[in-house]
Swiss-Prot record:
This is tRNA modification GTPase MnmE. GO terms for biological process: tRNA methylation; tRNA wobble uridine modification. InterPro entries: G_TrmE, GTP-bd, GTP-bd_TrmE_N, GTPase_MnmE, MnmE_dom2, MnmE_helical, P-loop_NTPase, Small_GTP-bd. Binds 1 potassium ion per subunit. GO terms for cellular component: cytosol. Its cofactor is K(+). The keyword Magnesium applies. The gene is mnmE. GTP binds at residues 226-231, 245-251, 270-273. (6S)-5-formyl-5,6,7,8-tetrahydrofolate binds at residues 22, 79, 119, 442. It comes from the Bacteria. K(+) binds at residues 226, 245, 247, 250. Belongs to the TRAFAC class TrmE-Era-EngA-EngB-Septin-like GTPase superfamily. TrmE GTPase family. Keywords: Cytoplasm, GTP-binding, Hydrolase, Magnesium, Metal-binding, Nucleotide-binding, Potassium, tRNA processing.
Length: 442
């Protein structure tokens, strides 16, 4: 894989002031000798000249030269800084491919090579991708902490604890005659296994909060027709996206939008009003409303506070313990007396008076902003959970009467699952899956 040379546009296919074309591999400098009218630079040098095709000038460029491992990729690399027109940039890329000394890179292949060349571990590689795709400040900070290795320390501590137990078991098996060896029976080992499980549970609990940071907080707006769901969505996303009408059943499909609060990304779903109806299309919309409730992290149940005979929708009964459910009383502007709602969240979507709702949401999710030291993406969470399962198997073996020499098999599996987070990956398909999510040219 690393014996060939790859190239790609690293700056995106848009008109811009400057574009970057990256070439990496053993033929990188040889390609430039063919297409560059200018001085072939030394490593870490920038040179100025023309890109040409058989002496036909194409663009005047700056070229950055990186020899060997003195760059991100860890192999001979050239970066061409060209004028950023889409056509101009693609003409240069086509010229590079025309030499037949390079092929077009796959998405994430430069980062994959950096990983395989030992320049970055798998955590840093994924952190780079997360930095690129960060939409809000909290996501950016989480990805940066991953890149700086702050999150890695939590996992490395678990790995060290497992290694210590494996080491003691191996000494017990191989050198039982040594006086200084701690005798590790099942009774002695079980408390250590239980402590490991507690450590895993704590890590998984914290890590699961990372999903809310990376994927956004899925927020479902539900309620009876004309309760003000669409009005609230439009206010939150600052856009007239949902249709507002006095006619019940106007919203037939789920309307989506995003908004940022306190640095956190919220993904909103405005659903069809829930009521009893014989209208087939409206029934389909209501079914979709219930589906959205199942997927949500935060459920905002919007209720028309001005209605004397309010429809009693027991939506809380349809929620799970891990979901957050809030009752929101709308249309405060129509109330003569608000005393009835003094302990409730009361808003007026019509007049954009929703400050108390925003403050309530901020207080609920404040813990996410404080959890800046440890975050994990979906791949890392999966590996931690697999590690925990292996530790559970070790515990089961010990409780079933088997000795440490059997439990060590599962401990080694747990160790491998955690080490995979940093790059001890034997499965090439897994690597391809991880890096294929990266941008072309990265």
């Amino acid at each position: 894989m690393l014996s060939d040379t790859i190239c790609a546009i690293a700056s995106g296919q848009i008109n811009q002031a400057i574009s970057i074309i990256r070439i990496s591999g053993p033929n990188a400098f040889k390609i430039m000798e063919k297409i560059f009218l200018g001085k072939v630079g030394k490593s870490m040098e920038i040179t100025f000249g023309w890109i040409h095709d058989d002496n036909q000038k194409i663009d005047q460029v700056l070229v950055l030269w990186f020899a060997g491992n003195k760059n991100f990729v860890g192999e001979d690399t050239v970066e061409i800084n060209a004028h950023g027109g889409v056509l101009n940039t693609n003409l240069i890329l086509e010229l590079i491919l025309k030499t037949k000394l390079a092929r077009l890179a796959n998405p994430g292949e430069f980062s994959l090579r950096a990983f395989l060349n030992g320049k970055i571990d798998l955590v840093k590689a994924q952190a780079i991708n997360d930095l690129i795709h960060a939409e809000v400040k909290v996501q950016h900070q989480a990805a940066l902490n991953q890149f700086l290795g702050k999150s890695s320390n939590f996992i490395k501590n678990l790995i060290e604890k497992i290694e210590e137990i494996i080491g003691i078991i191996e000494v017990n098996i191989d050198y039982p005659e040594y006086d200084d060896v701690e005798i590790l029976t099942s009774d002695v080992l079980l408390p250590r296994i239980n402590q490991l499980l507690a450590d895993f549970d704590q890590l998984i609990k914290i890590a699961n909060n990372s999903r809310l940071i990376y994927q956004g907080i899925k927020t479902c707006l539900v309620g009876a027709p004309n309760s003000g769901k669409s009005s609230l969505l439009n206010i939150l996303i600052n856009e007239n996206k949902a249709i507002i009408s006095e006619i019940p059943g106007t919203t037939r499909d789920v309307v989506e939008g995003n908004f940022v609060l306190d640095g956190l990304l919220f993904k909103l779903f405005d659903t069809a009003g829930i009521r009893k109806t014989t209208e087939k299309i409206e029934q389909i919309g209501i079914e979709k409303s219930y589906e959205s409730i199942k997927k949500a992290d935060l459920i905002l149940h919007i209720i028309d506070a001005s209605e004397k005979n309010r429809q009693n929708l027991d939506l809380k009964a349809k929620t799970r313990p891990d979901q957050i459910y809030l009752k929101i009383y709308n249309k405060s502007d129509l109330l003569e007396n608000q005393e009835e709602f003094k302990d409730e969240i009361l808003i007026s979507a019509k007049y954009q008076k929703i400050e108390n709702l925003l403050e309530k949401i901020k207080s609920i999710f404040a813990f996410l902003g404080k959890n800046k030291e440890f975050v994990a993406n979906s791949f890392q969470i999966s590996q931690i959970e697999l590690g925990k399962l292996a530790i559970l198997d070790a515990k089961t073996s010990l409780e079933s009467g088997f000795g440490p020499e059997i439990a060590i098999v599962d401990l080694r599996i747990a160790w491998k699952e955690l080490k995979t987070i940093f790059g001890r990956v034997d499965d090439e398909n897994l690597l391809d899956s991880i890096f294929s999510k990266f941008c072309l040219g990265k």
